[in-house]
Design a protein with these regions (language model features):
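Rossmann-fold dehydrogenase core element
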Residues: 83, 98-114, 131-137
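Rossmann-fold NAD(P)-binding glycine/threonine-rich loop
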Residues: 88-107, 115-118, 123-126
Length: 249
């Protein structure tokens, strides 16, 4: 059996924008083979279709379903033998705990596949040692009604709880406070996905501004995970933890 046959892939949410991008990307590689899709909106015949996430034959399931169904899907996938790559910021803490117990296979949970977002989180963690105040502003397209974004919540919870927030002027879609951090949300079609982290101390400020202009930006993070797939073992959470060894901070 050759290397291609060793890595067959099912994409859950394969008819969505990211699912289609990832399908095309996997088809461009020699070491993974796209064989199946799970998505109620998929009407094609090129791939095997799964109505439910049961009796899975593929080696890997890449999960890109909406946050509204992601935890329900993972509950089903826990009963399979497939290795999992989960690309959602909507996985709840209970499901994370369950995933951690599956030590017999690869479980890779990546809330955000943007490499820029991963570096922003790493740098923010380091900056929090030298600044006493921080706030987060996240901007997304108008179709994203939930706020704050999962990426912003994840970052706020990662930063030390003893760092507070400063006020920010403006007309915002929502303002929330998570782990004592203010998160300011904007929704407008002039944005795809942006996040700014503003640090302040007594004498200076430092801003980390990250902007995604095209969903293809997420493919680089997927490339990183698939390139390192054979080396990753057990449970892995966050792209930043996978790439952290590349930089000394």
């Amino acid at each position: 059996m050759n290397e291609i046959a060793q890595h067959t892939v099912l994409i859950s949410g394969g008819a969505g924008s990211m699912g289609q991008l990832v399908t095309d990307y996997i088809n461009s590689r020699d070491d993974f083979t796209m064989t199946a899709i799970h998505d109620p909106n998929y009407e094609g015949q090129e791939y095997k279709t799964y109505k439910t996430l049961t009796n899975i034959d593929e080696d890997i399931v890449i999960e890109f379903s909406p946050s509204s169904v992601i935890n329900e899907n993972i509950e089903l996938l826990l009963n399979s033998n497939a290795n999992l790559i989960i690309g959602s910021s909507g996985v709840n803490s209970e499901m994370i705990s369950k995933l951690k117990t599956k030590t017999d296979r690869k479980i890779i949970v990546i809330p955000n596949f943007s490499i820029g977002s991963a570096y922003q989180k790493l740098f923010s963690t380091t900056l929090s040692e030298n600044f006493y105040s921080v706030n987060i502003t996240e901007k997304h397209h108008s179709n994203k009604q939930d706020a704050p974004s999962g990426t912003a919540i994840d970052l706020a919870n990662t930063l030390p709880s003893n760092i507070n927030s400063h006020e920010k002027d403006g007309d915002f879609y929502q303002i929330n406070n998570v782990n004592k951090k203010n998160i300011y949300s904007l929704r407008d079609d002039k944005f795809l996905a942006e996040q700014q982290v503003d640090f302040v101390n007594e004498y200076e400020s430092f801003n980390l501004d990250h902007k995604v202009y095209d969903r293809k930006a997420y493919l680089y993070g997927i490339k990183v995970v698939l390139d390192l797939y054979s080396d990753l073992e057990g449970f892995n959470l966050g792209l930043e933890n996978i790439i952290a060894k590349k930089i000394n901070i």
